[in-house]
């Protein structure tokens, strides 16, 4: 199985805020309309206290996916060399501890189609 969009269009990088803005030609300017941005930030913020020491939310997201034995590869975004290096390092660390994985599963978010997503 190939896991795609592991950072939930960027919300699981931990860098989005309610003030995040993008250039008009950037697809995120229409994807992260206020309603979606608010929900995405709220869900990501709820995960921040769970980030392991010396880790990042992006690393935690990748390692969470690695807990699934059916996943053979993950396709994360890599706009910069540092992203490639960080993603590779996350993979080298392997899956998250079972206790943390179980805690993260409690944060599952089922996105329902809404007006902005049609």
Walk through the language-model features, giving the residues of each.
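Short acidic/glycine-rich loop or secondary-structure boundary segments that cap or lie
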Residues: 2, 9-22
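A short, mixed-charge helix-start or loop-turn motif at secondary-structure junctions
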Residues: 28-30
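Generic non-transmembrane alpha-helical segments
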Residues: 46, 50-53, 99, 103, ...
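Conserved short secondary-structure transition element at the edge of the structured enzyme core
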Residues: 3-6, 22-24, 33-93
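A generic structural signal for secondary-structure junctions
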Residues: 16-17, 89-92, 109
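Short coil/turn segments at secondary-structure boundaries
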Residues: 116-118
């Amino acid at each position: 199985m190939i896991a795609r969009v592991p950072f939930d269009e960027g919300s699981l990088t931990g860098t989005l805020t309610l003030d995040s803005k993008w250039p008009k030609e950037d697809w995120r300017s229409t994807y992260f309309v206020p309603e979606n941005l608010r929900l995405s930030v709220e869900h990501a913020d709820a995960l921040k206290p769970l980030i392991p020491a010396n880790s990042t939310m992006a690393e935690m997201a990748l390692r969470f996916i690695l807990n699934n034995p059916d996943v053979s590869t993950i396709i994360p975004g890599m706009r910069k060399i540092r992203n490639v290096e960080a993603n590779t390092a996350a993979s080298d660390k392997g899956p998250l501890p079972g206790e943390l994985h179980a805690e993260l599963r409690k944060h599952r978010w089922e996105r329902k189609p809404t007006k902005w997503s049609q």
